[in-house]
Amino acid sequence: MRRFTLTAALVLLAGLSGLSGHGAEKTKLTELMQRKLVNAQKVLAAVATNDFKAIRKHAEELIDISKEAEFKVLKTPRYELLAEDFRRAAGELVQSAKDRNVDGASLAYVQMSLSCFKCHKHVREVRMARAD
């Protein structure tokens, strides 16, 4: 489990380097991504310990972070779809916490993580295509 957390953290942090922005915009985006990573790690710890209150709290925080206007990295239909997938999975985490369903929370966490990986891949691909 710890290895998965470390891997997820490295992937998310690696994605930060592919994000564009200038000055305050880049700083704000980096801060939001770091908050997202911290909360995702806290959700994982809460799922592992059946701490449903913490699952709900940090999943709700992740939803709020994803809705912040500055969080919009790209204006593509695919990005919007991936962002919605992330919020849906985080919402499933909230519901699983309310239901005290650790299996549902575990699955929702994996789905949320996959949405992060897919989104970071999409952002890198779009950035590389624009750089060409």
Label the predicted regions.
Residues 1-9:
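Bacterial N-terminal signal peptides that target proteins for export
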Residues 11-20:
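Hydrophobic h-region of N-terminal signal peptides that target proteins for export
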Residues 22-132:
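Sequence context surrounding c-type heme c attachment/ligation sites in exported
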